[in-house]
UniProtKB/Swiss-Prot annotation:
UniProt keyword Oxidoreductase present: no
Keywords assigned by UniProt, alphabetized: Host cytoplasm, Host Golgi apparatus, Host nucleus, Late protein, Virion
Any GO CC annotation of this UniProt entry: virion component
Record family assignment: Belongs to the herpesviridae UL24 family.
Region feature Disordered, mapped onto this chain: 1-33, 254-287
Up-regulation conditions: Expressed late in the infection cycle.
Keyword Glycoprotein: no
Subcellular location: Virion; Host cytoplasm; Host nucleus, Host nucleolus; Host Golgi apparatus
Leader sequence segment: none
Protein name, entry field: Protein UL24 homolog
Length: 287
């Protein structure tokens, strides 16, 4: 009897264990089924937000260079996005090997060239930037930007031109595409060949677009300035007239005026003038 009771107890314990195992397995499967759609939804929402940000940045740069808007998004991220007489090349999803930064902007002017690496972090809630998820995003974004700057330095062909690499971490709200924060992670200067550097990044990017700044029309102003300078130079080249020259000029002008006002008879010979001066009498006339 005792053995039978023990066997029954063992069977009950085994059945209880199997039931608990099945329940825990069911809960695990249910929790995984619940988590997977949420993770996928978050991932898809982040991808959609990235694509919307790319389109918004291109549209904002078009407003800056072509007019028709204030270009608030572009100026918020890159204050010097419209260089005088320069250009900016925007590249998205640049494959650097171990890292793939979201956006790289090449800003070229007459004096310098900048390579701005942008890592984008999308946020569902924009009330506070000190939450656990945002702090984690900031930490991972900082590591990604440092690796990207190191990979850019390794990929660049050495040259004589200096390129400043500026790393920016941008937090964007998924709703409204508002810029929550822009943080500068690091800044380095490398000596490269600018043409080969551009070709290397262009071949590794999925999408790029170039914006060129138009020169301001200063032709009329330059002409007037040139005319003023030429007039000044002409005044300096011609010496001031002396006193004798001024007197001679006045005398010649006075003589010209007198000759113009004299009658025609005044220019005759002396004999004719004498005959004209003497009175002519007619003998037949009755005085």
């Amino acid at each position: 009897m005792a053995r039978r009771r023990k066997e029954v107890q063992r069977g009950e314990s085994r059945s209880h264990r199997s039931r608990t195992r099945s329940k825990t397995a069911h809960h695990r499967k249910f929790s995984r089924r619940q988590l997977r759609p949420s993770l996928r939804a978050r991932l898809n929402a982040g991808i959609r937000c990235h694509n919307r940000f790319y389109r918004a940045l291109v549209r904002s740069l078009e407003e800056v260079f072509e007019g028709g808007g204030d270009g608030r998004l572009a100026y918020t991220i890159i204050p010097q996005c419209k260089p005088a007489g320069g250009k900016i090349v925007v590249m998205f999803e640049v494959n650097l090997g171990l890292r793939k930064p979201d956006c790289i902007c090449l800003l070229e002017t007459q004096h310098e060239m900048k390579c701005i690496v942008i890592e984008l972090k999308t946020c569902r809630f924009s009330k506070s930037l000190m939450t656990e998820s945002k702090l984690r995003q900031g930490y991972t974004g900082t590591l990604q930007l440092r690796d990207s700057a190191r990979l850019l330095e390794n990929l660049a062909v050495p040259g004589t031109e200096k390129v400043k690499i500026l790393s920016l971490l941008v937090f964007v709200a998924q709703r409204g595409m508002n810029i929550l924060a822009v943080k500068t992670v690091g800044e380095t200067v490398i000596n490269v060949s600018s043409e080969l550097f551009f070709v290397t990044l262009a071949t590794r990017s999925q999408y790029l677009k170039t914006f060129c700044a138009k020169l301001e029309p200063r032709v009329s102003h330059a002409r007037s300035k040139y005319q003023q300078e030429s007039a000044k130079n002409a005044d300096l080249a011609s010496p001031a007239p002396s006193a004798l020259q001024t007197v001679a000029a006045l005398f010649s002008s006075r003589v010209g005026k007198e000759s113009a006002t004299k009658p025609a008879s005044y220019s005759t010979s002396t004999e004719e003038s004498k005959n004209l001066s003497e009175p002519c009498f007619d003998p037949d006339s009755n005085l």
